[in-house]
Amino acid sequence: MNKKNVLQWLEDSARVYPEKTAFADPSREITYIQLVTNAQKIGSFLAEKIAMNEPVSFYLEKSVLAISGMFGAVYAGGFYSLLDTRQPEVRLYKILDVLESKILLTDEENFAKAQELFAEREIEIVKIEDILKKAAVNHSVLDRIRSDAMHTLSNFDPE
């Protein structure tokens, strides 16, 4: 059986439908090839911030930026948790306490609120827009992470 992960599905779609819209929100849309590029930029940035299987928290609405960041977390070898911006503060704090995230990604619209809410937390807060402007794709790092993840999975025995 040919095993595929979510990144392989995304990359296959980008090869077949590079200019087709992958996702859209009320203010923007993104093609498959743009989504892969953005996710790889974010993944390259996050690879310097987290270790394999560590969480990345997100504080923003479901959007093109959010999906780019979530795929970026997977490229970095981590996992993601999208915090609902409408949740009560106490609930958000409990989620972060359980996750023990080192980094929280947000967008320009929610950045000030995230800084206010999480000022007492030991968590780095970064705007996804800033990552996309400044970060470059580091293919060698992303390839190493994927290879390590595939090696780990090939040795996994659920029984």
How should these model regions be labeled?
Residues 1-159:
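Carrier-protein-dependent adenylate-forming modules in NRPS/ANL systems
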